[in-house]
């Protein structure tokens, strides 16, 4: 909402899909125009020209994506992020980078305080960024909902005449806090704020290995992927260019020539639920698998049995 009101000529949000379905719903509810494309065929050197084809129209206010990606768990490379950042600067667009799954590219030893490698981010390549970090994801702190929106200093302090005319507050950071957060949210509890601050402090001090804690998701993904693949399914978004995607919170599955809705409907008959890739903006056919609730050994056996029955009935 904020980004769409900074410049009357720029109201459109560009989604790099697939993405979190709720974000797409939000722009529809608010009546904000949007564009999107599926990154499946636009990795590496193909990404820049594709994004620029939208930015060159002159009406894109912000670019939105998640990294690691929900639902595909693909991770943009530093070169791809550099491309996005440089284009955002050139066309004066804001990058809203969803880092809900911070440091969960488990192929790399991330999350060690003040030691490389670090989380890949567009913030290295432009000043036009807003980073979103979720307490419920990186710290598995899902009870009292809380998150961080980190805004670059250059963007926070930037004056926008359109904001001043509309709200009598011209500085982006002030408008974000005093107008948009105040009016459009109920805030968050003091206890959640203290809890998140304590977890950030412990992570920075090296006493909380939050990446080690969340690596349990990679173990569950690895086990369930093996079961799906053994029964004839395939990973839809399977590569980060030439490298297999990391195991993590989500991944994507397809089966034969079934469409997303067909596969979802059929799996429900076997007691397996997911969401359709269509709802994520993907142009590929399949479903998103979430392993967060696969927390008991017998569930893996049950999944194996149900997928065996599915494969037998669809041979």
Descriptions of predicted regions:
Residues 190-193, 197, 210-225, 229, ...:
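Conserved glycine-rich beta-strand-loop-beta hairpin in the small C-terminal domain of fold type I
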Residues 122-215:
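Conserved core segment of the aminotransferase class I/II
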Residues 56-58, 125, 265-315:
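PLP-dependent enzyme catalytic core of the Aspartate aminotransferase-like
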Residues 30, 90-91, 270:
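Helix C-cap/helix->beta junction micro-motif
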Residues 15, 36, 96-97, 196, ...:
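Hydrophobic residues in well-ordered beta-strands that form the structural core
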Residues 1-12:
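Phosphate-binding glycine-rich loop
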Residues 11, 90-94, 126-127:
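A short helix->loop->beta-strand "cap" motif at the edges of active sites that frequently abuts
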Residues 41-112:
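Active-site phosphate-binding strand-loop segment of PLP-dependent enzymes
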């Amino acid at each position: 909402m904020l980004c769409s009101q900074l410049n009357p000529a720029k109201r459109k949000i560009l989604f790099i899909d697939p993405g979190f379905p709720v974000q797409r719903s939000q722009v529809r509810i608010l009546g904000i125009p949007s564009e999107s494309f599926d990154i499946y065929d636009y990795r590496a050197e193909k990404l820049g020209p594709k994004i620029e084809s939208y930015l060159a129209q002159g009406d894109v206010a912000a670019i939105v994506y998640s990294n690691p990606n929900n639902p595909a768990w693909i991770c943009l490379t530093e070169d791809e992020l550099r491309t996005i950042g440089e284009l955002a600067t050139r066309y004066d667009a804001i990058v809203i980078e969803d880092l809900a799954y911070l440091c969960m590219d488990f192929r790399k030893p991330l999350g060690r305080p003040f030691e490389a490698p670090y989380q890949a981010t567009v913030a290295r390549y432009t000043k036009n960024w807003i980073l979103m970090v979720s307490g419920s994801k990186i710290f598995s702190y899902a009870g009292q909902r809380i998150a961080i929106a980190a805004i670059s200093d250059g963007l926070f302090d930037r004056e926008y005449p359109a904001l001043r005319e509309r709200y009598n507050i011209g500085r982006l950071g002030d408008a974000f806090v005093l107008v948009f957060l105040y009016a459009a949210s109920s805030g968050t509890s003091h206890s959640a704020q203290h809890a998140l601050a304590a977890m950030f402090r412990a992570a920075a001090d090296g006493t909380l290995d939050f990446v080690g804690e969340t690596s349990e998701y990679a173990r569950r993904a690895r086990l369930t992927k093996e079961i799906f693949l053994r029964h004839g399914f395939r990973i839809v978004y399977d590569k980060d260019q030439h490298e297999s995607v990391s195991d993590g919170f989500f991944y994507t599955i397809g089966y034969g020539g079934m469409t997303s809705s067909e596969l979802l409907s059929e799996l429900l008959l076997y007691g397996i639920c997911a969401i359709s890739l269509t709802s994520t903006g993907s142009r590929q056919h399949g479903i998103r698998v979430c392993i967060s609730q696969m927390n008991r050994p017998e569930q893996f056996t049950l999944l194996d049995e149900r997928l065996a029955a599915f494969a037998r009935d669809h041979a």
